[in-house]
Amino acid sequence: MVTKRVQRMMSAAAACIPLLLGSPTLYAQTSAVQQKLAALEKSSGGRLGVALIDTADNTQVLYRGDERFPMCSTSKVMAAAAVLKQSETQKQLLNQPVEIKPADLVNYNPIAEKHVNGTMTLAELSAAALQYSDNTAMNKLIAQLGGPGGVTAFARAIGDETFRLDRTEPTLNTAIPGDPRDTTTARAGADVASLRWVMRWAKPSGAVGDVAQRQYDRAAGIRAGLPTSWTVGDKTGSGDYGTTNDIAVIWPQGRAPLVLVTYFTQPQQNAESRRDVLASAARIIAEGL
């Protein structure tokens, strides 16, 4: 059975996936923010992509917003959204049991490994993928959608012409420079409906917001660069070439929600993750508001 908390999370999100909003305009101070982001990128030795959407007036800030970046585990948001969308017309879908076999386990399975030779529901798999970044759970969602192409097809159906998922976990994390597989852009990442249903329909104190907020502490990533009084729900991702990503919905005190996407990748395959770069990018954005 699906727990009440997970059921609320899934049903609320599934009922509320909206269409993409119109093209935003740019902040007047975008140039100054972009200069600071460029300086950060230069000092980091990698390539940085940033997109901010302020939902109060649909304005945005972009830095390398239309360049492709490997998504890594941030792609789990789109996969979970696609399953939630299916559940709109298949009312019992989220309660459907999925068998977990020993051969299903891959490189990171903190939840699925506890259910080997048993089952998990699609709701539980979605929660495991989003909250714990469980890679076996992600693969089960992908299988439910007919393979990576099914996730991409969902992206096209909601108006995202940029997102593409080509492989399963863990190979989707190879992040090879110039490889278009399993990539998107910061602009598309911020504007897709898979983030907008969280931002528009989940409150920071609600079930969806709760799951996102409990994923990671404030020690790294976007959260570390923002005021501690701001509520943040995010999904991180990392892979080869020091690829370090974080996508977030942010509820600042006294402001409408913000959607912030930060992607970072490096030229060396064995480079370390750089969540500090994402924190610095978030700090630059926050100071520019």
Curated annotation (Swiss-Prot):
It holds the Pfam family Beta-lactamase2. One of its GO terms (biological process) is beta-lactam antibiotic catabolic process. GO terms for molecular function: beta-lactamase activity. InterPro entries: Beta-lactam/transpept-like (IPR012338), Beta-lactam_cat (IPR045155), Beta-lactam_class-A (IPR000871), Beta-lactam_class-A_AS (IPR023650). It catalyses: a beta-lactam + H2O = a substituted beta-amino acid. Its EC number is 3.5.2.6. Residues 1-28 form the signal peptide. The class A beta-lactamase family has a specific amino-acid numbering system, sometimes called Ambler or ABL numbering and often misspelt as Amber. A multiple sequence alignment was used to derive a consensus sequence and then the consensus was numbered taking into account insertions and deletions. This allows use of identical numbers, e.g. for active site residues, despite differences in protein length. UniProt always uses natural numbering of residues, hence there appear to be differences in numbering between this entry and some papers. This is Beta-lactamase Toho-2.
